[in-house]
Each structure stands twice: as structure tokens, then as C-alpha cells.
């Protein structure tokens, strides 16, 4: 089976890219070959061409975001017309795919959420920005493609797709993210103490962990303000962002250098998960962050907003707390999680077992086979007329 997987910029640290890499690795045993179509990709062990994957470059031109967005879509259309694939799976908003995985959620919803927390001039720009208009226009066109199957990675995104674009539920398949549950393990208290000392942290203080790229969207600044009101907590911020310098400056301005560690991007987050006592991601919008799954597998209670796709499961299984995207609410949630850490830690580990990668891989393989069989049946039907 030959499939095309489309992701414009392939950053191995990104959640969507890690999902793609894991999916390809797990499906290679089923004789699935993937061609990844991308504008650019960072080189590492997982981005080299192998027997189960290769890379096709999409040429992008243009001087602004809107032009580049449209240019990428046109380049992909050309590539698809000159190559034969059994299935086309897109992680970008474009026309002509068989499957669109909503890993980035609904752009119209993101813009609406952003507008709510923005000053008036930003609200105005969000309405007229050519890039946002182009993306939302494409989303609307995709909703009218009868042969496009949507894959939502959370019930949050599934419902938003219905609410925003009236896509019938029959065209939406819910496949939540999967994770290798054996790759992340809980740490003993003794190990946590040892590792905290190695990082220069106080071994006696509870440690909150944040992992994510996109500090403003994922609530890193609000979390920092919450920690400022909790002198008995400490924080580790892991991830790359254009505002990395700004958040370091804010840590210094608040005089929190002794209890806040900003690491920048890390290819291996396991050492930080081993140190942490809980995980916090107070995002403005996050369809289904893989970092939360890694935290659950590490038996870390999680604190998230209701705009994070896994929030409903966290609440249902008492594996953490749902907070508002405000410092006071985050601080209160962290205190409650710490107070109930033993129970919530056990619940977090149990919840993680629902997201075993083998389960989601099988769901994807079933979907691929179903769609390919449907294509064959349609071709036979067309050939008889």
C-alpha cells in the first residue's frame, strides 16, 4: 500500500510530526510505504529515507503567509497529479485528499478563540488578514468535498467540525492519538530527588512540567505567573519558541531563577518527565497534545484547560484538573493536584493505557483498507456505466 502524507513543515519536535513518525514506524510492518510531501524537514534519524518512507519536496513561493499557503497547496496538487498513491492523507488544509487529519484543529475556531483574548486592533486584523481568510475559505471548500474523510483526534475537534461547517458525523472518524506506553515509565520518589538535584532544583519542592512549542498559545506565560504566586512550587519549561528569550527575561524580572528552569527544545523529554511531579498545559487551543500522553504514561497528574482535547478524559478519570487560562485558576488547580497527587498519579497511569499506539495504528490501518476498498468499488461501478 502506497500512501502520501502531507505536512508542510516537518519539525521532528512537533506533536503532529511525532505522530506521523510513530504511525509510519508502526505501519511499516503491514507493508505500508509512505511518501511524505513537505516544503521542508529537519534532518534526524527519523527523517531519512527508508524502505518504508521517502520524501518529496513541495516548492513554495510568495512573500507573505497567504501567498505561501496557496503556493504550497498548488505545488502539492501538481505532485499528486504526477504520482500514483493508493491514499492521500493530509495534515494540512488543502483540496484533493482522501483523508484530512485534524491535528491542528479548526482554524476558524482558533481565530475566534484568539480574538476573544486579543485587543481591538488585533481583533480587526484577524477579520481581514489574507492568510486567515485563505485558510478558512479552504476549510469551507473541504467541508463540501463529499469524498473527503475527516479524522478527528478528540471529541472536542469532532464537535467543532460539526458546529462550524455542518460536516455530517458519518464523514468523521474519531481516532485519538496513540503512544508507545512502554517508552515512558513512572519514576520513583528517590529518582525524582536525585534528578532534581542534578538540574539544580530544590529536591523538596513539587515540580511542575510544561512541554510545548508555541508558548503564547499553550499558556506558558500564564503558568509562569501562577508559579510566581506559589513560592513552594518550581517549574520546568521545555520547548522551542520565538519568544524563548522573552520568557527567560520574564523569569529574571520576577526573580524566579531559582525555581524556574527554561531548557529550550529537547530531543529527549524523558529526563524532565522523570523529575516532574505534575504536568501543566493551560492552552488557548490544543486539539490533542502528545505531551499530555507522555505525562500520563509517566504517572503525572495533568492540569489543562477545557480547550485541550483530552480534558474530558482527564476529568472523567480524575487524572488531574481542568483550569481556566488565568494565573489564579492555574495556581489553584496545581495546589489541588498536589494535595491529591497519590490518587491522581495512579489514575493518570491507568488512563494512559487507553491510548496504546497499537490500538490507534490498527484503527488507521482499518481506515486505510476501508477507503481503498471503497475506491475499488467506485471504480468498478464507474467502469460498468
Language-model segment annotations:
Residues 41, 211-213, 234-248:
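Glycosyltransferase donor-sugar binding loop
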Residues 129-190, 207:
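Donor nucleotide-sugar binding/catalytic pocket of nucleotide-sugar-dependent glycosyltransferases
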Residues 174, 294, 307-317, 321-322:
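Short acidic/histidine- and often glycine-rich active-site loop of Leloir-type glycosyltransferases
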Residues 301-305:
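Short hydrophobic beta-strand element within catalytic cores of glycosyltransferases
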